[in-house]
Design a protein with these regions (language model features):
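A structural signal for short, well-ordered beta-strand segments
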Residues: 93-95, 128-130, 217-221
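Short, surface-exposed loop/helix-turn segments at secondary-structure junctions
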Residues: 107-113, 168-183, 213, 232-237
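Extracellular structured ligand-interaction cores
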Residues: 123-127, 139, 184-186, 214-216
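Short, solvent-exposed loop/turn segments at secondary-structure junctions
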Residues: 35-36, 65, 96-98, 135, ...
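Active-site region of the double-stranded beta-helix
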Residues: 86, 115, 130-141, 149
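Non-heme Fe(II)/2-oxoglutarate
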Residues: 2-8, 12, 44, 52, ...
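Non-heme Fe(II)-dependent double-stranded beta-helix
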Residues: 1-120, 232, 236-242
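Double-stranded beta-helix
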Residues: 138-202, 226, 240
Length: 242
């Protein structure tokens, strides 16, 4: 029997406006790319493996094939490969729950760049974030600094960012050039929306002070054969997508 999270979905063709917006700003939100039932299934699978306080879970897809399918879905891969103009590979996955009324709910991530972790010298990594429930400021959505991806990897202070202390603010802390400070943009997402972030786009997130959880399923991609740091916790490695 075919699983709910499968590869039987059409490719997605970006419009010229969408393509240009991403390359100018370093991010884009694709509306309603995932169905409510797909989002519910992703969240359900992660909840089955969650610990009491719902800390982040890394690379569960390597044990749960149905989650690994999400990395390889044509409607996702087609977008990634169009944006990097090349064949891509998957690198890692992560669920950030921000589960309401838990010790990790109110964590607000410092402004950081994902590529500070990946360490790809050419800026050829992208991370998708699938909103498994609605995400808004009060329940911990992300904010971005448009155009900051053009700066390359900025200097940063390395900080613990996985299984960190409860109530702490994780994320490598960077010094953002002043010209971006007035352009902070909150990303309000509906269930099923997918955010795509350039690896060098500076971003952070708010804490969750509500009764509404904010689970985001994140998957990182890289230009096939690109250089990256494996990482002690992330254990990144290339996965074929075709």
């Amino acid at each position: 029997m075919e699983t709910l999270l499968n590869l039987n979905n059409p490719t997605y063709k970006l419009s010229t406006v969408e393509y240009n917006f991403f390359h100018e700003n370093g991010y884009i939100v694709i509306k309603a790319l995932f169905s409510e039932t797909e989002c519910d299934r992703i969240y359900e699978l992660f909840c089955e493996h969650a610990e009491e306080d719902f800390p982040a879970i890394i690379n569960l897809d390597r044990k749960v094939p149905e989650l690994h399918n999400v990395m390889k879905m044509p409607k996702v891969v087609s977008i990634i490969e169009e944006l990097i103009d090349s064949e891509a590979s998957g690198l890692m996955t992560q669920m950030l729950f921000k589960e309401a009324n838990t010790a990790y709910a109110n964590q607000a991530w410092e402004v950081h760049q994902d590529n500070a972790y990946h360490q790809n010298p050419n800026g050829e990594t992208l991370t998708i974030n699938i909103a498994c429930k609605d995400a808004f400021v009060e329940n911990g959505t992300l904010y971005v600094y448009p155009g900051s991806h053009k700066e390359g990897i900025l200097k940063f202070e390395a900080r613990k960012s996985f299984r960190e202390d409860k109530g702490s603010q994780p994320g490598n802390k960077l010094l953002l050039p002043e010209k971006y400070l007035d352009h902070k943009t909150d990303l309000i997402m509906k269930k099923g929306d997918m955010l795509i972030l350039h690896g060098n786009c500076a971003h952070g997130s708010y804490g969750n002070s509500t009764e509404f959880s904010r689970p985001l399923y994140s998957i990182t991609y890289i230009k096939k054969g690109g250089e990256f740091l494996v990482g002690r916790n992330a254990n990144r490695k290339e996965f074929a997508l075709h």
